[in-house]
Amino acid sequence: MRQRTTIYNPYSSHDGIITNLNRTNFQLSSIPNHLFTIENKYTITTTTTQPNKSSLYSAIKELRIQTKFNNNESGIPIFSFHYEPGLNIYAVPQSNVDKLEFWQQVEQLIMELLGIKLSSQQWIANVNSFYYHDIQPQPLLNLKEGWKFNLHPKSNYDYIYNQDKIIIRELLTNVSEIEFNLESGIYKEIGLFLIDEKISTNDDLNLSGIRVILDEDSNTNNKEESIHKTMFHIKPRHRSFDDSTTITTTKIIPQGLHPILSTELNTTTIVIPTDFDVEECKFYYYLNLNKSLIFDQFQNIPIGSQLIINNGNKNLELPEYKINQWGNELLFEFEFDNDNDIPHHINLTVHSRYQLPQNNHSHSQISNVLNSLPNIFIGCNVKEGNLLDKSPFDTKRDVKIGGNYEIYFTEDTVFYHLQNSDNSGNSGSSTLLEINIPHGKTTFDRVNNITSLGLLIGVLMILYAISIRVFMSTTSKTKRD
């Protein structure tokens, strides 16, 4: 097994950070108020360490799980954890396999990893995989005993499975101290890097530092031979604006059964990216929509945009309890030629699906539905796009599925992310919207009793009417006789 740990030091120097370093131990302590951001990447070859796993899940070509507990921890400016908060799962079958076998194996693998049961009906199809989303993040339950590592509680992680190997990345933020030790069976490569601001730009980051190798199979007894001074450049796929001001706020405008997702943009801090490699840019709005809500693609496209993606159940008439899929995936595109074209407001009107009456004795006539915030970003084609996946931190090197909106863009696209405000008016949560949907107030027993009583009364009325007619007919015949 291989472990590659990259430590990003936001300070201007590495002086005083390394507290111990030898062939078996590496300890670091951050500068006060300049805490580390760390990516741990574990690579396990399944054909050698778990030969039975490939045959057990032979119908699965690829499976990817991306979980985000904290929306603010995306790894900017180096690491790529820019997927949607909550749980995102992607699955691809092998060619020419039985569909039932594939879904049984997917269900079994997800139960093993997450402890949740997903049926095939809960997924939707996107451009290159099946996709499942839930606002509730899920930790990996347990890892194999032979792997000798565990993920940190509630760390954002990215799990990739295919027939040859398993890759797990996790992101740790605000780390003040960390220690690494030589372990049997694990090849460890630990990198400590800072960004050299003197020669770095937003589109070309220069990383400078050292790499330390901890490997029991190493033949060297010399500490210096395990330490490698390193400097390299990366062209980041995910970028941020120079101004760190929070620039989008999304809230719900109540409108009965037709609520509006209203996003306000601080256009004074949003400009067309001017990085050296940038060519054409467009503005995008991405949203995972709960199945209790309907998007009408014929009437409710936000002003100034065009609908690019609408994956999921598009039936506008079905009630919520008839929808098996988790919801819909939406992507809108706004064209703009200059800074004045950037929209000040984006309003997306959705409609509520009919909800089952609450089967309890509550007096509430409202269902509370939680939905993810929209992801708003600027996507740009760049020159020398082939350099993007040369970065060791670019996930497209390992897998082509997943990443939510990423799969709908070409390989030469970079993303400038607009941060959501914490002051969203969303029940104290900066990552979720709360939508109130009216519904009936009763119980199923009461509905059944009233229905049965109504039918009984109807039958009695019919019988009464028939008996009256028979009686009147008999009386009339008697009088004639």
Swiss-Prot record:
Q: Spell out which residues lie on the membrane's Cytoplasmic side.
A: 473-481
Ranges facing Lumenal side:
1-451
InterPro entries per UniProt: Pbn1, PIG-X/PBN1
> Keywords for this entry?
Endoplasmic reticulum, Glycoprotein, GPI-anchor biosynthesis, Membrane, Transmembrane, Transmembrane helix
**Record-annotated membrane-spanning stretches:** 452-472
Q: Give me the glycosylation sites of this protein.
A: N22, N52, N72, N174, N206, N266, N290, N347, N360, N449
Q: Which GO terms describe its biological process?
A: GPI anchor biosynthetic process
Q: Which Pfam families match?
A: PIG-X
Q: Identify its membrane topology class.
A: Single-pass type III membrane protein
GO CC annotation, single: endoplasmic reticulum membrane
List where in the cell it is found: Endoplasmic reticulum membrane
Q: What is stated as this protein's family in its record?
A: Belongs to the PIGX family.
Q: What PANTHER family does UniProt report for this protein, alphabetically?
A: PROTEIN PBN1
The entry's function note states: Required for proper folding and/or the stability of a subset of proteins in the endoplasmic reticulum. Component of glycosylphosphatidylinositol-mannosyltransferase 1 which transfers the first of the 4 mannoses in the GPI-anchor precursors during GPI-anchor biosynthesis. Probably acts by stabilizing the mannosyltransferase GPI14.
What's this protein's name? Answer: Protein PBN1
- Origin species, per record, is Candida albicans (strain SC5314 / ATCC MYA-2876) (Yeast)
